[in-house]
Regions:
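Short acidic/polar active-site loop segments enriched in Thr and Asp
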Residues: 41
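Active-site pocket-lining/capping segments in soluble small-molecule metabolic enzymes
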Residues: 1-26, 44-48, 53-101
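Short, acidic/polar
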Residues: 26-33
């Protein structure tokens, strides 16, 4: 995600809820707190987190948390589809990314 654009939207439209997706690779409390401090309303956590890690983040932040309960897991870093597309020649926009099911 474009953090610069997100910050501009937060400044210009303070009532617009901004969500951080898996492409922001938020996989720990520090990442969730950083987005919270920047003004994001919700974060979608990285897919590979355990239920215990998700619980810890939920209990220690005020930002809304969203997570995947089931689905394909990226072979590369979750949400970093460009790297996967460079390795395998598959486009993230065509939904033909390399995943582990």
């Amino acid at each position: 995600q474009d953090l610069g654009l997100a910050m501009k939207l937060i400044r210009e439209f303070p009532d617009l809820p901004i969500h951080g997706s898996t492409q922001m690779t938020v996989h720990n409390l520090n990442g969730a707190l950083e987005l919270q401090d920047l003004g994001f309303k919700r974060v979608v956590l990285a897919r590979e987190l355990s239920i215990n890690e998700i619980d810890y983040i939920c209990k220690n932040t005020k930002i809304e948390i969203e997570c995947f309960a089931h689905g394909a897991l990226c072979i590369s870093y979750s949400g970093q589809c460009l790297f996967s597309s460079m390795l395998g020649g598959r486009s993230r926009k065509s939904w033909k990314m390399r995943t582990a099911l």
